[in-house]
Curated annotation (Swiss-Prot):
Pfam families: LCCL. The keyword Transmembrane helix applies. The keyword Transferase does not apply. It is a multi-pass membrane protein. InterPro entries: CRISP-LCCL_domain (IPR051957), LCCL (IPR004043), LCCL_sf (IPR036609). This is Uncharacterized protein YIL067C. GO terms for cellular component: fungal-type vacuole; vacuolar membrane. Keywords: Membrane, Transmembrane, Transmembrane helix, Vacuole. Its main location: membrane. Disulfide bonds: none annotated. It is found in: Vacuole membrane. Residues 1-26 are annotated as: Disordered. The chain crosses the membrane at residues 119-139, 245-265, 317-337, 340-360, 371-391, 405-425, 443-463, 475-495, 519-539.
Length: 678
């Protein structure tokens, strides 16, 4: 009896009859062969598959006997019996669309089979693209702007401003010094200025600024002014704006500069004005801020004639359109890794150099342009690491071997939508997700609710896609870790959790690692948001201090004294420290007080009582402004008074000011300030 193996892996069992044998002498031996089952590799695999299916069936039979809720949870947790993660099907539904979808493979790569030639074509194409890009940004970013008079006289340099910068005003409160001596000239002076695009929203103030007894926030910082059409002096095209108004925001409000492509204008300093009534602005900018009392400085806009302007118009709209157009063929024809990296790098430099630059540059100062490039490269290296992680964790699965039509229709447009965040999502009435900001900004709660509902809907859609692909369990664990980390960071004492654009994109994009249509849509927006956030604000911290959140707003300095008024001496003010406040600050530098009248510092000293009559005697310019305002009014004017603790020798070293108390001059009617600081 024995077992023999043949070359075909068939096993034969031989049974030998002991009574019939064959020996060496030639006798015959009778044997019986029994053919057994063939255990080839293929058959073994099929047997295992059948066993696996039987095990799966037994699991589902057990699941059927469980409670419905338990069955639902286990099915959600374990995923479908047969996971699937298919690319979008719509490109295959119609013949003409299928031809377009197959063109990169069937035609482009067939006609140009050499990978080296395709790569050389790509390099030449990108060089041509960059040359046009440079020709668009050069006249605005690098070439200095001038006004060239027709009479052949010397050309006049044009000053570049940002949307929220001052012209000849230093800042809020007492930044201009006593009687505004550090600012100016406040009259008889003209400037040629250049403003960028998007100043209809870029000229908003996001930190509260006191204007009289009002706190201005979440609106354009233009006080008074408005468009003027005068037959007496047709060169004057606006009413006077208070001189601490943002000039570029005011120019858009007056309609002399476009919010779409910026421009140049002439600013004429007009000196003191008796009041600044609110006016409705152009380009849907709303009403300006009203101020019903005098101020030492103002300016108006004048028409520019008798010459040619150069370098005035902001090309950002053309730059974005160019880069969107030139990036499309690469994304469509070439492998996804080329389209991804080329378009993300180009999108980043589009933001830095044109769409949303992090620094104000002045072409008359080449160092500022070099600084912009330096900042751009500084942020680019860590950004490339983030983009690599995003590619490996999510984008590669979606785009690699994906549908070219889906990439062009779904991923690419939403990518540029995210890049253009400053003209898309930033226009929503949401500044930051803090309790104070949500209360102060009109429409913020409604907008946040809408955004949250949209994100939740997208999350459910994408969670279902992950579940269908059988990876819900894995990503659920990942996002539980993310949420736990955010909760831990938000619990740190003295710090506030801040989810910036790039953080939001980086957290959400791994959950879009599927091949369906939803992944194309969501990934594009999220990658664009990452680029937008880093290009404009760098890798801002995920946790910030209370002082950083104030953004220069009052609330972090020494508390002001309590402002008093004595009816018996109705032209005098006094103040005293709160009993719980220290007499001097910890360093010992703040030893006196600073008094503002109509938002301009008029007194610095150690006295705790000040007479308005004495201030008028010591400051003839103040007395003249008050008298002129009285003559132009109905016999009374409002004086807005605020006081703070300050250093006598260096008044800019100060604490917070009180809110404004209102003294009606000259009859002495007093309205005490509201609680709080300014």
């Amino acid at each position: 009896m024995g077992v023999h193996f043949d070359d075909n892996a068939n096993t034969t069992w031989e049974a030998t009859d002991p009574g019939v044998s064959s020996d060496c002498d030639g006798q015959h031996r009778v044997t019986e062969s029994i053919q057994l089952q063939n255990f080839s590799n293929t058959d073994m695999e099929s047997m295992l598959d059948e066993e696996g299916r039987e095990n799966s069936k037994s699991k589902w039979l057990l699941l059927k006997r469980k409670h419905p809720i338990q069955k639902f949870i286990e099915r959600v947790w374990n995923g479908p019996v047969e996971p699937s993660d298919e690319p979008p099907s719509f490109p295959k539904r119609w013949g003409w669309l299928k031809k377009i979808d197959d063109f990169p493979q069937t035609t482009f790569k067939t006609k140009i089979p050499s990978k080296l030639i395709r790569l050389l074509l790509l390099i030449v194409y990108c060089c041509f693209w960059m040359r046009i890009f440079y020709s668009l940004i050069y006249p605005y970013l690098i070439k200095p702007p001038y006004f060239h008079p027709n009479d052949g006289s010397e050309k006049i340099p044009i000053l570049s401003l940002s949307c929220n910068s001052y012209l000849n005003w230093e800042g809020t409160n007492n930044e201009c010094g006593l009687n505004a001596k550090n600012c100016g000239p406040l009259d008889n002076k003209e400037y040629m200025i250049r403003c960028p695009a998007l100043c209809d929203r870029g000229g908003w103030t996001y930190s509260a600024i006191a204007v009289g007894n009002r706190r201005v926030k979440y609106t354009g910082y233009e006080i008074g002014g408005g468009a003027l059409f005068s037959e007496e002096d047709p060169m004057v095209v606006s009413y006077p704006y208070r001189s601490d108004s943002f000039p570029c925001a005011s120019a858009v409000h007056a309609g002399v500069i476009s919010p779409f492509y910026g421009g140049c204008t002439k600013v004429s300093m007009q000196g003191a004005q008796n009041s600044f009534p609110s006016k409705k602005g152009m380009y849907n900018t709303g009403f300006s801020v009203a101020f019903n009392s005098f101020f030492p400085g103002s300016y108006s806009f004048r028409d520019i004639q008798g010459g040619i302007l150069s370098g005035c118009y902001d090309p950002r709209a053309a730059v974005v359109a160019l880069n969107m157009l030139f990036g499309l063929p690469i994304f469509y024809l070439y492998d996804s890794i080329y389209g991804y990296w080329i378009n993300t790098i180009v999108g980043y430099w589009t933001l830095v150099l044109s769409l949303d630059p992090p620094l104000l540059t002045d072409a008359h100062d080449p160092a500022s342009v070099y600084e912009l490039f330096s900042v751009g490269f500084q942020r680019l290296l860590p950004l490339c690491f983030v983009l690599y992680v995003v590619w490996k964790s999510a984008v590669k699965r979606t785009l690699e071997n994906g549908s070219p039509i889906a990439k062009v229709i779904l991923w690419y447009p939403t990518f540029w939508l995210g890049i253009s965040n400053n003209v898309t999502f930033d226009r929503l009435p949401v500044d930051r997700l803090t309790t104070t900001d949500l209360k102060e900004q009109a429409g913020a709660l409604t907008a946040v609710g809408s955004i949250a509902a949209t994100i939740l809907t997208c999350a459910v859609i994408q969670a279902y896609s992950l579940w269908k692909s059988g990876r819900f369990k894995k990503y659920f664990k990942i996002y539980i870790c993310f949420i736990g980390g955010l909760i831990a960071l938000g619990s740190l004492p003295g710090l506030n959790l801040r989810i910036h654009h790039y953080i939001l994109g980086s957290i959400l994009v791994p959950g879009c690692a599927t091949r369906g249509s939803s992944a194309y849509l969501f990934q594009g927006i999220l990658v664009g948001l990452i680029l937008s956030g880093v290009a404009r604000w760098d890798f801002a911290s995920i946790v910030e201090t209370d002082t950083a959140l104030l953004r220069g707003e009052a609330g972090a300095s020494l508390k002001p004294p309590i402002l008093d008024f004595n009816d018996d001496q109705n032209h005098s003010l006094s103040w005293h420290l709160n009993a719980t406040d220290p007499v001097i600050d910890q360093i010992g530098n703040i030893d006196g007080f600073s008094l503002l009248l109509n938002d301009v510092e008029v007194y610095v000293g150690k006295n705790e009582t000040v007479s308005i009559d004495v201030l008028r005697m010591e400051n003839p310019a103040l007395a003249q402004m008050m008298d002129d305002a009285l003559d132009a009014s109905n016999g009374t004017i409002d004086l807005y008074l605020r006081v703070a603790r300050a250093s006598v020798r260096s008044p800019t070293n100060r604490g917070d000011y009180t809110n404004a108390g209102v003294l009606q001059w000259p009859n002495g009617m007093w309205q005490k300030p509201e609680p709080g600081v300014s």
